[in-house]
Design a protein with these regions (language model features):
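Vicinal oxygen chelate
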Residues: 2-3, 7-15, 66-161
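Short, hinge-like loop/turn segments at secondary-structure boundaries
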Residues: 54-55, 120
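Core segments of cupin and vicinal oxygen chelate
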Residues: 11-53
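Short beta-strand/turn micro-motifs at beta-sheet edges
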Residues: 60-66
Length: 161
């Protein structure tokens, strides 16, 4: 069995690279990312855990505008430390003229988020789960690890033969 240990990077194809770079460069800095690398028509940022890249779409790709409910990318959520960070992100977005589609608020029980658009209209989110969600996620992960470990033990393998 192969186990994914995390998502390494995400690359968004953008319609106007320079316009998107002007949007993403200060946003990524605000979110604690540093520049990983920049090439012609491509730029990436890293925060030690995640790599986030933008790349210029080719001419054919520019003809197909992003629409949230099409097959493929729906939205990307940046998990933040706390509700205050979500509120700070909204203030940053407002100060920088970003389009906020759903303002900071509790969208589900114990789930606080702000939703906004990039220059191509791609939906992004800054969010924070509350303590109840974190504890439930930790319990689910522990159960999965225990079940996986049990399948790998010699006595468990004998039962499956």
């Amino acid at each position: 069995m192969v186990e994914v240990v995390g998502v390494d990077h995400l690359v968004l194809s953008v319609g106007d690279f320079e316009k998107s770079k002007k949007f993403y460069a200060p946003l990524m800095e605000f979110l604690g990312f540093g520049v990983e690398a920049e090439y012609e028509g491509m730029m990436g940022w890293a925060n030690g855990k995640t790599l986030f890249w933008i790349a210029a779409a080719d001419e054919e790709g520019k003809e197909h505008r992003y629409r949230k409910d099409d097959i493929g990318f729906h939205h990307y959520a940046f998990r933040l430390r706390n509700r205050e960070d979500v509120d700070a992100l909204q203030a940053y977005l407002e100060q920088n003229g970003a389009t906020i589609v759903d303002p900071a608020g509790e969208y589900y029980d114990d789930y606080y988020a702000v939703f906004f658009l990039d220059p191509d209209g791609m939906k992004l989110e800054g969010m924070r789960w509350g303590e109840r969600h974190e504890q439930a996620a930790k319990k689910r992960a522990a159960k999965r690890r225990a079940a996986t470990a049990k399948k790998r033990t010699p006595s468990a393998r004998k039962k499956w033969r």
